[in-house]
Amino acid sequence: MESSIFKPSSMDLIRAGLQDLDKARALFDQLKADDIPDERCAELLSALAHACDPDMALSNFVDIVNAMQSSQRDLEHVIPDNDALKRLVTVLGVSDAMGKFMRFKPQLVEAAAVDNCNSHLFNHAQRRARLLKAVGADPDEPAMPVASKDLAEAATALRSSYRNQLAAIIAQDAVADDPASIQPTISRELSDLADAALEGALAIARHETEGSEHVRFTIIGMGKLGAQELNYVSDVDLIYVVEPADKDVDHQTLIRVGTKMGTMLQRVCQSAIMGVAEQPLWQIDGGLRPEGKDGALVRVLSSHKNYYEQWAENWEFQALLKARPVAGDPDLGRAYMDMTRPFVWSASKRKNFVYDCQKMRKRVEDLIPAPLKDREIKLGRGGLRDVEFTVQMLQLVHGRTDESLRTSNTLDSLQRLSEGGYVSRKQAVRMSQDYRFERVMEHRQQIWSLKRTHLFPDLGRASVGGLEKKRDIDVDELNQNQELRRLARAFGLHPEELVDKYDDTRREVRHLHLDIYYRPMLPVNAQMENDQIVLSVEAAQERFESIGFGDPDAAIRHVQALTAGVGRAAKINRIILPAVLQWLGEGQNPDMGLLNWRKLEENFGTESGYLGFLRDSTSAAQRLCHILSNSRFLGDALNKSVESISWLGDDDNLQARTREALDVQTGSALERFGSNINEFATSMRAMRRHEIERIGLSWMSGVISDSDSLKAMTDVYDAIIDASLTWAVRHQIAEFGVETAPAGITVIAMGRYGGREVNFSSDADAILIYRPADDADDGQANAFAKKVVEDLRNILQGPTTLEPKIELDLDLRPEGKNGPLVRSYASCEEYYESWASTWERQALLRARYAAGDAELARDFLINIADPLRYPTTELTEAELQNIRKLKARMEAERLPRGVRRERHLKLGKGGLSDVEWTVQLMQLQHAGDIKDLRVNGTLEALDVLEAKKLISAIDAIQLRKAWTLCTAARNGSYLWSGRANQADILPDDIYSLGGIAVYLGYGAHRGQHFENDLLAVMRKCRDVCQRLFYGKTEGEAAAATTATASAATQQPQTAPRPRMHVIAPRLERNRRRAQR
C-alpha cells in the first residue's frame, strides 16, 4: 500500500477486524477530507487490528478528530507518534464511554495517548498529592488537609483529575499483551486512585463543614477497596471513624460534625452538585458499618468496639478481614485496625462461623435471577466470590495461629497459603490464573460503558448451562454477538473459545474449592495427586472444627479408617469424601453424620454397591449426608437396610406407596406366613419400620409435603392393621374348626389415626366392634371376636418379635379401660344411645372405617356415630361447659411432670390440642346443618369453617400455622432423636432445637430462631383458642395468654394423672350406678 495513496481494500479492512466495511471506508474518506495524512491513516488501520471493537474505535476516533479540529486543537501535539495513536485506538476499542468523553475533554485524549505526567506509574503518595493539589489542599499535611477552593470548583477539579488518571490506567491495561498478568497491578492502581479521591473529598468536606478542625476523621475501606483489588466501576464500601481533635469537644458535637463531614464527602463522590459539569465518580456503600444502613453514619472507636463485642454477626467479622484505612487521620486508622484485628483472627472460634459464612454465600447464589445464574462472573457458581470465599475461609481458620496469613488481598493471601503449606503450589497457581481471568473479564465488561456490571455477555438461549449441563451453542450466532466478540478479542480468542474457557474456569473453581478446603482433611495416603499438601495435626483439627465437628480428633480417626487400604470402598471414599465432609458440615450434627457414614461402610462396604452408586449420583450422596447428619432414627434405619440408599437417587422411588401397593405386600405376607404368627408379626412391623424410613427419607428430601407424609403413614397403618385382622380371623376360623367366621369384625379408627394424621411416632387409636354372623349365636361370636382381638394385639404389639411395636390404643372404646376390648354392634348401639357423654360425641368426630368388615363399619358410622357427632340440635350450655372443663382438666392433669406448659407440642398452650378441640367444638355446633363439615381431618374441617365464614381468615391462618408447625416439629423431633417418648416436648437446649428446626426448613444451627418463631405462633394460636373455644373477649384472651407466658416458668407442675378419656368413662359409670 502506497502511503501517498491510502485506499484500503476490503481484505485490509477485514484483517483489521472491521465488520461494517462500507461505514469504515466512509470514515477513512472523512479523515482524508479532514487532511489527515495517508501515512497516519495507514497507522490507524494497523492500530485497529489490536482494538477489541475496531468499528467503534474508528467511529470514536473520527469524532475526536472532528471535535479537536473544531476547537482548533493541534492533533499532532495530542497524538505525536504511532505509539500514542496505538494507545488511543486501543482505549477507544475497549471503552465506548471513554471515547465519548474524549470528544469534549481533550485532556482525556492526552492522558490516554501520551500520559505526559506518567500518572500510570504513580505510587499511592503521588496519587494522593495529585488530587489534594487539585482541590487546593496541602499534600504534606498528613492528618487534616483542607481544600482551599469552593465546593463547585474543588469537586470539578477532583473529578477531572481522577478521570485523567483513570484514562491512563485504562490505556496501560488495554495495551498489555497479557492483561491477566497485570490485573493485580491495575486493581492496586485503581484502589490507590480511589484512596486519593477520598482524601480529596474529605479535604473538601473539611473546608465545607464548620468545626471540622475539632474532629479527627478516618475512612476505612472495606471489600475490594480495602483489599486493594478495586474494579473500574464499583460501589466503594466504607466505614467512618471519628474522635475529638481536642478535649473540649463533647460527644454530641463530635457526632454531629462528623456526620456532616461524612455526608459531604459522599456528596462530592457520588452526587450531582450545582455548578459541577463533571459526572460523579462512584457510589459509596455504607452497608458494612455497624448496624448497616440503619446504623449511625459515623461512630467513635469505642462504639465500634462495643458493637463488635456484643452484636456483630459472623459474616461481619469475615467482612472485617478486608478492612484498611484508606484516607483521613492515619493514627486513628491504625487504632481502628489494632482494635478490630483480634476480632477477625478469633472469629473462626465463634459458634457456627464457617457454616454461617457458607450459608451467606449460598444465599447470595440463590438470589441471582435464574436467567443470570450462568452469566454472573462475580457472584455466580465458580465465580470470583467463590475464589475469595475459599481463600478467606482458609485464612480465618488458620490465621488464628499462623500470623503469616494475616493479609487482605486475595492473590497475596493465596500465595501466603501456598507458602504456609495450606494449599499446594499447583492449586495456588491454577486458582490465581482463574481469578485473574475472571477479573479481567469483569473489568472489560465495566470499561465499555463505565458502568457497574459483572455479567458475561448475553448468549440468548445459550446463556443457561456451562456447569452441570452443556450450553445450547450455535457458533454462527456467537460470532454475530458483538459484545461477546469484543470481549473475546481482549483475550485473543474466538467467541466460542471464550465461552468454553469461561465454563472451564467456573468448573475448575468449584472443583478447587473442594480440593483446597476439604481434600487436605484426608490423610496422606488418601491424596489423589503428588502435589497435594498434608496438614499438620493442629491444622487438620482446626479445619474439622471450623466446619462444625465437635470432636475433630474422632473425625480424623473416622476419615483415616474410611480411606485406609486398597479395597474398593477405600478407593471410592478417597474420591468422594471431600464433598461428603462439606455436605456433612452443613448438617446439625456432622459428628453423627460421619459416624453413620463409617458404620454404613463397615456394615455394607464390602458387599453392597451403594458406594459406587453414591459416587455416580451426586444428588443421592448429598441427600444421604443431609440425612445422616440430621436424623439419628434414619441413620440407624439405613444401617439395617442399606438398599434404601438407592431410593435417594430417584424421586419416584421416594414417593409414598399407594394403598394398593401396600396391600400387595401385606397380601404376600399373608400367603407366606399364614400359619406362623411370629414371622407374620415380624413382617408387618418391619414393613411399618421400612415405610417410616421411606416416608422419612422422602420428607427430609423435600419430595413429599407435610400433609402427604401424614396421609402416607395413615395408609401404612390401615394396610397393616387390615392384614393383621385378616390373619387373626383366618387363624381363629381354623382354631374354632368352622368354615366361616362366626362374627364380622371391624376396626374404627379414632383420634389422629381417624383424622388421617398419623405421624412417625403415633399410636393407632381405635374401637373394635363385632357383629354375629347370621347363623352364629352370640356366645360363639363373642368368644371368636375376643380371640381374634387377642391375635391382632399380639401381631401388632405383643412380644412375638424384636421389631418395634405398633401400639393399638383402645382407650377410646365405650367405658374406656374398664370396658371390653371388643364390643358387639348391639352393645355399642345401646351404650351410645343411653350413656354417651359429650366428650364421646366429640371423639366420634374422628371415627372412620380403617379395617375389617366394611359393611359393619358403615352401619356403625351412619346409624350410631353420625346422629351423635352431627347433632341437629344446638349444644346446651351445660354440654358446652362440660367440654371446656374437660379440656381445662386435661391441660392441668395430663402434662408430664417437669414440662412447662408452653413447651408441650400436643397439650401445651397453643399446641395441637388447642387447635383440634377448637375445630371439633365448632363441628359439633355446625356439622348438623353443614354437611361439608362432616370430615375427620383437622385442617379439612378448618378449611370448611373458613370457607363458610364461621371463622375469620386471620384466625384460621393462626390455627392452621400452629397445627402445621407443631405436627412437623413432632415428626422432626422423632427423626432427629429417635425417641418417641420425647417427640411431644420442645427441648430446652438450643442444639436439639436446631436439629428439629432443620425439618421445618431452617438451616442447621438455627434452634433459637425456630424456638422464637414457634412459641410466637403458639401464643397467637392460644389467643384464638381463648376466644373461640373458651368464649373470652379479645382483651381477656390476650391477658390470659400473656399471664400464661409470664407464669410458665414459675408454676409448679402437677404429677401425671390418667388420660381424660379414661377418667371420663369412670365418671359415667359412677353416675349410672347412682341412677340405679
Swiss-Prot record:
One GO biological process term: regulation of glutamine family amino acid metabolic process
Annotated stretches, region: Adenylyl removase: 1-521
Coiled coil: none
Cofactors demanded by this protein: Mg(2+)
EC number: 2.7.7.89, 2.7.7.42
Region annotation Adenylyl transferase: where it falls in the sequence: 524-1076
InterPro entries recorded: GlnE, GlnE_rpt_dom, NT_sf, PII_UdlTrfase/GS_AdlTrfase
GO molecular function: [glutamate-ammonia-ligase] adenylyltransferase activity; [glutamine synthetase]-adenylyl-L-tyrosine phosphorylase activity; ATP binding; magnesium ion binding
Gene Ontology, cellular component aspect: cytosol
Region (Disordered): 1042-1076
Claim: Nucleotidyltransferase is one of the keywords in the record: yes
Family: Belongs to the GlnE family.
PANTHER family xrefs: BIFUNCTIONAL GLUTAMINE SYNTHETASE ADENYLYLTRANSFERASE_ADENYLYL-REMOVING ENZYME, GLUTAMINE SYNTHETASE ADENYLYLTRANSFERASE
Its job: Involved in the regulation of glutamine synthetase GlnA, a key enzyme in the process to assimilate ammonia. When cellular nitrogen levels are high, the C-terminal adenylyl transferase (AT) inactivates GlnA by covalent transfer of an adenylyl group from ATP to specific tyrosine residue of GlnA, thus reducing its activity. Conversely, when nitrogen levels are low, the N-terminal adenylyl removase (AR) activates GlnA by removing the adenylyl group by phosphorolysis, increasing its activity.
Name listed for the protein in its UniProt record: Bifunctional glutamine synthetase adenylyltransferase/adenylyl-removing enzyme
Source organism per UniProt: Bifidobacterium longum (strain NCC 2705)
Gene this chain is encoded by: glnE
